C-alpha cells in the first residue's frame, strides 16, 4: 500500500501537534541540561521571556514567562509543519539523512533568528554567544531527529488508524 499523506486534515494536525510538543520538549531538555552543565543561560523559553521584558510589553512578568513558553512551542510546531510539507510532497524522504539535513538547516535558521532578535531588541543576555549558538545548533538537530522518528512512527499509526477507523 503506497500511502501519501495529505497536506492537512484532522489526523495530520493531531499528529503534528503531538510530534512538535515532544520534539520541542526534547530540545528544551537538552538546552536545560546544557545550561545546568555549563552554568549558562541556554534556556530558549527563558530567553524569549527576557526578550519580552526587554520590549516593555505591558503585561505581567508571569504572562511574559507563559508567552515565552507558548511562543517556543508554536515555533516548534511551525518547524514540524514545514517538515511535514517537505515529506508529504516527497521533497525529502522521511529518513535519518533528511533529519540531519533539516536539523542543520533548522539550526542555522535558529541561530540567525536569535541574532536578529538580540539585535532588534538590544537585549544582551549574560551568555557566551558563540557557545550558545553552538548549543542551539545541536539542540535543533536533536529536535529534528526526534521529530523525524516520531513522524515515521505516527505515520505508521496513521495508516493503520485510517484503514480501520473514520471520524
Regions found by a protein language model. Name each.
Residues 2-167:
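Juxtamembrane/disordered regions of integral membrane proteins
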Amino acid at each position: 500500500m503506497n500511502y501519501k499523506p495529505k497536506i492537512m486534515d484532522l489526523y495530520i494536525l493531531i499528529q503534528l501537534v503531538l510530534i512538535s510538543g515532544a520534539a520541542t520538549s526534547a530540545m528544551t531538555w537538552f538546552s536545560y541540561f546544557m545550561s545546568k552543565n555549563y552554568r549558562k543561560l541556554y534556556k530558549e523559553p527563558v530567553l524569549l521571556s527576557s526578550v519580552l521584558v526587554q520590549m516593555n510589553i505591558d503585561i505581567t512578568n508571569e504572562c511574559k514567562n507563559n508567552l515565552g513558553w507558548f511562543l517556543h512551542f508554536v515555533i516548534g510546531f511551525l518547524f514540524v509543519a514545514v517538515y511535514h510539507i517537505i515529506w508529504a510532497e516527497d521533497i525529502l524522504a522521511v529518513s535519518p539523512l533528511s533529519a540531519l539535513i533539516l536539523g542543520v538547516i533548522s539550526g542555522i535558521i535558529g541561530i540567525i533568528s536569535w541574532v536578529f532578535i538580540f539585535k532588534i531588541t538590544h537585549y544582551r543576555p549574560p551568555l557566551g554567544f558563540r557557545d550558545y549558538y553552538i548549543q542551539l545548533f545541536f539542540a535543533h538537530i536533536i529536535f529534528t531527529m526526534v521529530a523525524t522518528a516520531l513522524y515515521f512512527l505516527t505515520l505508521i499509526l496513521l495508516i493503520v488508524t485510517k484503514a480501520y477507523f473514520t471520524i
